[in-house]
Amino acid sequence: IFFADDYDPNGVNERASEALILAVMQLKNEPWMKDCRLWMYRGQWGQWEIDNIEMTVPMSPEEFGVKRQAILKHQSQVHDAPFRDPENGQLAWQTSIDRNTALADLYSRLGLASYEAMEAFVRYHIED
């Protein structure tokens, strides 16, 4: 299960994440849950520190284009919504795209394979 972490200062991702975690906690003793993994990503509101990243998903130029188009299908991402980056004034989708390319550039500079973009994830561990 992939979900946004709760770093969103507008509270939308936080509420969705809380609902997901509550549901998972209610289901944690189901047999299929032993094979279930929860992975958190960050959208517009920041990036994981490199030493905290547990998984990355590299994207080719074509895959990155598909992601960009998928983001733009959401009305909240294309209009002049109040969800702008407080530092540079970009819309959420622009910041997310920039974050994905910046991570790929960082991995390349570290001597790892080069990709168009990368999404980073940190695993959420279900409490007992």
Summary of predicted features, one role per range:
Residues 1-128:
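Metal-dependent de-N-acetylase/amidase catalytic core
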